[in-house]
Design a protein with these regions (language model features):
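His/Asp/Glu-enriched, well-ordered alpha-helical/loop segment
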Residues: 39-57, 61, 73-85, 90-174, ...
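A short acidic, amphipathic alpha-helical/loop segment
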Residues: 10-13, 68-72
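Short beta->alpha connector loops
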Residues: 2-7, 61-64, 185
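Short, Lys/Arg- and Gly-enriched loop/turn segments at beta-strand edges
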Residues: 184-191
Length: 198
């Protein structure tokens, strides 16, 4: 569930209908509003409160401050968080103009200061983060233990999309997709299916 104005009760009904994932928590997601003077929680609160929801988190150091990353970690725990880049074409590229979505009908976005912006320069348009940046932010800024941040980037997403029988861990019989990095989380080697690419 995500890109949603759902109220809390709708989000709970979504669980009953089989929803298990909240897409990029805090981004394009309903939260507390006032209705006739009463506070009404939204999808955000349902995703944090209900264990049935795993949550995707764009931990790029831009979408969410370290304090919110810590709050998510405290409320969901390591096993219910999946780090996602939400990256678009400008990921890993220099500042400039890129298209979000279709090459023929995509939305023009501007990449600067480590984030993709809508033309108004205010709203974010996805992310330009890479996976190593997310691990770095979670460990260095939010203080999450490295092994837990790596689980959030590997086994947790694999489990949520139903491919944990082949991806997400290092073990006999698993796909040998590996990234080796140093203490600064700078990538040193990349292996896909056991073959070194970098």
């Amino acid at each position: 569930a995500g890109h949603s104005d759902a109220k809390y009760d709708d989000a709970v009904r979504a669980i009953e209908a089989g929803y298990t994932m909240a897409t990029h928590l805090y981004s394009s997601m309903s939260t507390i509003i006032r209705e006739n003077g009463y506070r009404v929680p939204g999808l955000l609160e349902a995703a944090l409160l209900h264990d049935e929801y795993a949550v995707e988190v764009i931990a790029d150091g831009k979408h969410l401050p370290a304090s919110l990353l810590k709050l998510i970690y405290k409320t969901k725990g390591v096993d219910r968080i999946a780090l996602v880049t939400d990256a678009m074409r400008g990921a890993g590229m220099p500042d400039g103009e890129y298209l979000l979505g279709s090459l023929s009908k995509g939305q023009k976005v501007l990449v600067f200061d480590g984030i993709a912006h809508m033309p108004d320069g205010i709203s974010f348009a996805g992310s330009v983060a890479t996976a190593d940046r997310l691990i770095r932010v979670m460990t260095k800024e939010a203080g999450i233990p490295l092994h837990e941040a790596v689980s959030m980037m590997t086994i947790n997403p694999a489990r949520e999309v139903g491919i944990s029988d082949k991806k997400g861990t290092i073990a006999a019989g698993m796909d040998a997709d590996l990234i080796l990095f140093d203490d600064d989380i700078s990538i040193k080697s990349v292996y896909i299916a056991g073959k070194q690419l970098i």
